[in-house]
Amino acid sequence: MSHTIRDKQKLKARASKIQGQVVALKKMLDEPHECAAVLQQIAAIRGAVNGLMREVIKGHLTEHIVHQGDELKREEDLDVVLKVLDSYIK
């Protein structure tokens, strides 16, 4: 079973939190707010996205790399994670 399926409820809860934070940000942008408050909300969204990314990467590393018996498959899965990290960190 894929770790994203196994951890579906936890990951969906994180995604819902992010969605709520984005909705709140959009409302903030419709009304006058201090820049600091808007920046704080953006930082909260970024933190939540980072947390979701961390959980998915952690599951991927554990399931597809640490517990993977096939060396070739392990290397392929590691390449996938490294490419995602490269694009995310840009």
UniProtKB/Swiss-Prot annotation:
<dbReference type="GO" id="GO:0032993">
    <property type="term" value="C:protein-DNA complex"/>
</dbReference>
<keyword id="KW-0804">Transcription</keyword>
<comment type="similarity">
    <text>Belongs to the FrmR/RcnR family.</text>
</comment>
<keyword id="KW-0678">Repressor</keyword>
<keyword id="KW-0238">DNA-binding</keyword>
<dbReference type="GO" id="GO:0001217">
    <property type="term" value="F:DNA-binding transcription repressor activity"/>
</dbReference>
<keyword id="KW-0805">Transcription regulation</keyword>
<dbReference type="GO" id="GO:0045892">
    <property type="term" value="P:negative regulation of DNA-templated transcription"/>
</dbReference>
<dbReference type="GO" id="GO:0046872">
    <property type="term" value="F:metal ion binding"/>
</dbReference>
<keyword id="KW-0963">Cytoplasm</keyword>
<comment type="function">
    <text>Repressor of rcnA expression. Acts by binding specifically to the rcnA promoter in the absence of nickel and cobalt. In the presence of one of these metals, it has a weaker affinity for rcnA promoter.</text>
</comment>
<dbReference type="InterPro" id="IPR003735">
    <property type="entry name" value="Metal_Tscrpt_repr"/>
</dbReference>
<dbReference type="GO" id="GO:0005737">
    <property type="term" value="C:cytoplasm"/>
</dbReference>
<dbReference type="InterPro" id="IPR038390">
    <property type="entry name" value="Metal_Tscrpt_repr_sf"/>
</dbReference>
<protein>
    <recommendedName>
        <fullName>Transcriptional repressor RcnR</fullName>
    </recommendedName>
</protein>
<dbReference type="GO" id="GO:0000976">
    <property type="term" value="F:transcription cis-regulatory region binding"/>
</dbReference>
<dbReference type="Pfam" id="PF02583">
    <property type="entry name" value="Trns_repr_metal"/>
</dbReference>
